[in-house]
A protein has these predicted regions:
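Hydrophobic ligand-binding cavity/cleft-lining segments
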Residues: 1-44, 134
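Non-catalytic interaction surface on structured domains
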Residues: 4, 29, 65, 91-94, ...
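Hydrophobic/aromatic beta-strand elements that line small-molecule binding cavities or substrate pockets
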Residues: 8-10, 63-69, 90-98
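Short, flexible helix/strand-to-coil boundary loops that buttress conserved ligand/catalytic motifs
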Residues: 33, 80, 119
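Glycine-rich portal/gate segments that line the openings of hydrophobic small-molecule binding cavities
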Residues: 40-85, 99, 104, 137-150
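A short, polar/proline- and glycine-enriched secondary-structure boundary/capping micro-motif
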Residues: 60-62, 87-91, 115-121
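Short, solvent-exposed aromatic-acidic interface loops
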Residues: 81-86, 108-115
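A conserved amphipathic terminal alpha-helix motif
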Residues: 104, 111-150
Length: 150
């Protein structure tokens, strides 16, 4: 069975509450989020979301993960499966950790299942890293300039 871990992080000079508010305000994603273009659903454990990503060259990917953890201002996690469990499972986590007067925002994704090596052979890993970095940068900019927009 294959296993891959993708992890990116950034420091955001803002309180956890502000970071959480922006990263869970799905309706505003089209305004600022270059990677997750659309997200729908309720952030409650057991609820299913609909997530639409924009990858390289305008490619789009839609998936429907199930929310597994919601700890406001600390952690959001969901699990997506392709077909049956064990084929290609994706456990994505968004963590907000105290760091000085701001936070460290960590986004990680653990991919498991027998299809994982095939998915990563088609350049998925590089596209996800670029997307995660774009998400992190855009979130940091959005949150740190919130006072300027208000």
């Amino acid at each position: 069975m294959g296993r891959r871990l993708i992890k990116t992080e950034t420091i955001i000079n803002a309180p956890a509450e502000r970071v959480w508010a922006e990263m869970t305000d799905f309706a505003s994603f089209p305004e600022w989020n270059p990677f997750v273009r659309q997200a729908e659903g309720r952030l409650e454990p057991g609820e299913q979301l609909k997530i639409r990503l924009r990858l390289d060259r305008g490619l789009k990917m839609t998936f429907k993960p199930r929310v597994t953890v919601v700890e406001p201002n600390r952690e959001l996690r969901w699990l997506a499966t392709l077909g049956r469990p064990g084929v290609f499972d994706v456990d994505r986590a968004f963590l907000i950790e105290p760091y000085g007067e701001g936070v460290r925002f960590v986004m990680s994704e653990e991919c498991t299942g027998w299809l994982t090596p095939v998915m990563f052979a088609v350049n998925l890993e590089a596209q996800l890293y670029r997307g995660y970095d774009a998400f992190n940068h855009a979130l940091r900019k959005r949150v740190e300039t919130a006072g300027v927009r208000a």
